[in-house]
Structures are given as C-alpha cells and as structure tokens.
Amino acid sequence: MGQKGHKDSLYDCKGSPVSSLHEALDQCMTALDLFLTNQFSEALSYLKPRTKESMYHSLTYATILEMQAMMTFDPQDILLAGNMMKEAQSLCQRHRRKSSMTDSFSNLVHRPTIDQFTEEEIHAEVCYAECLLQRAALTFLQDENMVSFIKGGIKVRNSYQTYKELDSLVQSSQYSKGESHRHFEGGVKLGVGAFNLTLSMLPTRILRLLEFVGFSGNKDYGLLQLEEGATGHSFRAVLCVMLLLCYHTFLTFVLGTGNVNIEEAEKLLKPYLNRYPKGAIFLFFAGRIEAIKGNIDAAVRRFEECCEAQQHWKQFHHMCYWELMWCFTYKGQWKMAYFYADLLSKENSWSKATYIYMKAAYLSMFGKEDYKPFGDNEVELFRAVPGLKLKIAGKSLPTEKFAIRKSRRYLSPNPISLPIPALEMMYIWNGYAVIGKQPTLTDGMLEVITKAEEMLAMGPENEYSADDDCLVKLLKGLCLKYLGRIQEAEENFRSISANEKKIKYDHYLIPNALLELALLFMEQGRNEEAIKLLESAKQNYKNYSMESRTHFRIQAATLQARSSLEDGNRSLVSSVSL
C-alpha cells in the first residue's frame, strides 16, 4: 500500500516527534495493558497528551471511557465517553482521504488504484467507523428500545457501509499489507463482527426498518469475525474478547433465551485471567460465568475478589454489588440482598428508583420476626419510588419505568402489597435460568412462590387479584419447568392466557407467558407449535412493561426454533437419502 501523504503526528515522552502508526499502536497497547491491570487513571494519563494529534490515542482514550460507561451505566460516564468519542471522530475525519470511503471507496476497490490510499488513510477509515459504532453502542445504553439508534441511522449506516467496504478490501487480491496490517484487520473484524451480531439480535420490527435501508446481520458470521479478531494478536483483540464475553454472559442472557455458550466464554476468558489474575474486568466476567453455571458461592467469591482487586474505580464495585444482590436473591438470603441494594441506593446514581424499589422488595420478603434495619419501612420506600424518576438523554430506563408502575399501588392510603416483588424483578433479569441449574435453589424458590400463592388464595378478592395470581403462576411455572415437572409448568403458563381478560395492570404477563410456553415446547422438540406462540406474542400485544426486552427474547427464541426445525429437516432428508 502506498505511503504518500501526511503521517500520524505523535510525540513521545520527551516531546520528540513519532511518525509511525506502528509506534502509535504500540503506545496504545501499553495503555490498554495499564487499564487491564486496574491502573485506570495511569492509562488515561499516558494517552491524554497525544489525544489532540493521534487518532489512535484519541480513539483508545475514548474507548477506555466508553468501557467504563458500559460497566457502570453512570449517566456522567456515558456523557463524558460520548463527548470524547465525538472528538476522536473529528480527529479521524481530518486524517481521512478527502472524499469519503462510502462515496469513493466502492468505486476504487474494483480498479487497480487502491494505492491512492496511504496506510494511514486506511487506518483513519477503520477508526472513523469505530467511533460511529461506539457512539451507537452508547445510544443503546441510554435507550434499550433502539428508537434513537434508528434516528441516528445515517451515522450508523455510514459506519456499517465503511466496514463492509473495508471487509471487501481485506479479502481483495489488490490489497497489499502494510506494516500495521494486523491492527487494521483486527479493526475490520471487530466492526463487521459487532454489526452482524447486533443486527442478528434485533427484534423483527426494528430489523425491517434497518433492512429497508440496506442493513442485515448474520449471527454466525459475526461470531466468527469476532473470534478471529480475538485470536489475532492485534490492538483490537482484547476488545473482540470483551464484546464476545458481553454477548455470552449478558446479551444472550438478559436479551435472549439464556441459552449461553458457556464453554466458549470460559475458553475466551482463561488466557486473560492467567495474564491478569487481579484484573477487575476479567474477575467480574469470571463471576458472571460462575453465576450462569449456577455456582452461586463461587460467583460470590469472584465478585468479592473483584472488589478487593482495586479501590480506584469505585463504580466498578457497584457492578459487583448488583451481581452480589442477585446472587443472594437466588439463595433466598433477603438480608444480604437488601444490604447490597442499600449500598447501591447510597453510592450509585444509575437508577435510584430501581435500587429503592429493590430495597423495599427485599424488606417485604423479611419474616415478621426479622429485624428490619435502620427503621426502613417497605411501604414508605415503595411510595418514594415514583419521585425518583431519572431521565438519561431524555429517556427513562425501562427497568425504572417498571419499578415505578409497580410501586404506584402503594400510593393509596391502605395499599395492597405486591406478593413477591423481588422474585418478579428476578424474572425481568432472567434469573430463573440461573437457579434452574441448581435443583436445591429452584426448590427453595418454589417454596417461597407456593407460600405466596397460598396467601393470595386465603386473602380477600381485590382489584389486583387476577394480576397477582397470574404473576405467581408465571414464576411457579418457571420453577416447575426447571425441576422437570413439564405438565404442571405448561398448566401454569396456559392458565395466564386463559385469564387474559381479567388482568387489569400487568399486561406484560400475557406475552411473557406465551414466550415461556414456547420455550417449554422447544425443549420438547415442538418447534412448530413454539413458533406459532412466539408469533402471537409478538403480533398481538403492544404497549406493555418491558416490551422491548420481551421482543428481544422473542426474536432470540424464534431464531433458535427455526434453526432447530431446519436442522431436523436436514437430518430427515439425510436419513431418507441413505
């Protein structure tokens, strides 16, 4: 590749000019290494002097801020990362060829004029596309229903189109590898992989909008690109690893069916955990993996270890507190779960409404003989929740909206208590897929749910009776499913649809009951029936709590069911042909 044009203007520690991309990338890898050994401030300080001149220093600085924002969900972190990413994007723009990649590159790639681009200009393209991609990711953090993501479609389209062109370039016979080729190719794999993976997960209604303007995603191709990027020894290798770990331990779990490729996650994590045994980020992922496997005590140890590993980045502790809160919920240790919800409500600003709601939810699980700490009263806490509503970039968090809606029944002078609010929120975060790995935990949860069911049956009829009964049946059905009591689970899920017209407030229960029944059928190989149920859940219900999250799960389940059907049909054809 030609080397004409300006170079990346950098300065070393003594103020001498550094002219090569190779040296810039080496310095950025050093900064990433500092970051991964919990030296967060040192990493940023190391990069900062060069962020106004070097696109890689600027992008790495912004990427570290974005990783912090994605780990903490803190509104200030999100704002800071977004502003820095904009600055990095402007700097990359200055280093790009004057005509944009999307305008001119598709014409050039088919002619022997690729050497019109310097190596630096090609790197500027991948860095520019990465800035756009990371800004889109920040938007998703703020707005789970993707409306803003679509509104910013031109930016996203430019990024997507650039990655597609760069992917074609990497595979072109006319491409000659520059000195920093592995870093460039790693950047392409990161972007192409991220786009394909993300687009493959989106609900159909959003996909239709995106595909209308040329977007499409292939999950398998996305995973392959990221896996290749993760093993490529490039500047972006660790970013590919982190994205894959997020996908395997969070996205497929919270926005999917909980059908996690845990072996792949462990394989990805192992070399990094060996290299950075005290690295907080990797200890955190180790905790997530243990939790997903149902090894709750081991998960607790990992999260505690993660907190002990560093004291500088306190907000990273908050992520561990959130996970520890759920670990103790799974174990039915309400006082410990309350302790972590209380810590979060005092120390973290992501969603005070959610944290106070969880405090109240855990207090409501205490027995009459239990000591209620600090004089807190669950009714007063529930009443405080609606007044704590927070907006990030003009949007309310879906979990917060859910907590506020549920708390409103406490605003009446003589409120009717929520039956099992902590266990309901546990469903929203797909926690039953965790306890389902351990029959003892599932049995314990079923016991709590059955007691709540008995209390509802003994109590007087009220305006919430149908809603509360259906909630209990949904959660009971999940426990029964994981205990192998399939017929009973199906009966509980079906009874929710049968009582659809009686439900007054918790309309989310109906599409979610259909989703859970579909997942139950899929486990029995009844994929055609499952697809019909999923289609009904998707098409027939609108404007209910956590709708976007449910649609993500429906999409994941539909893809899984169709894939199983296709595999079954292929097996049938093979056996017939034999």
Swiss-Prot record:
TPR repeats lie at residues 280-313, 470-503, 511-544. GO terms for cellular component: centrosome. SUPFAM superfamilies: HCP-like (SSF81901). Keywords: Repeat, TPR repeat. SMART domains: TPR. The keyword Repeat applies. It holds the Pfam family Iml2-TPR_39. Belongs to the TTC39 family. This is Tetratricopeptide repeat protein 39A. The lineage of its organism: Eukaryota, Metazoa, Chordata, Craniata, Vertebrata. The gene is Ttc39a.
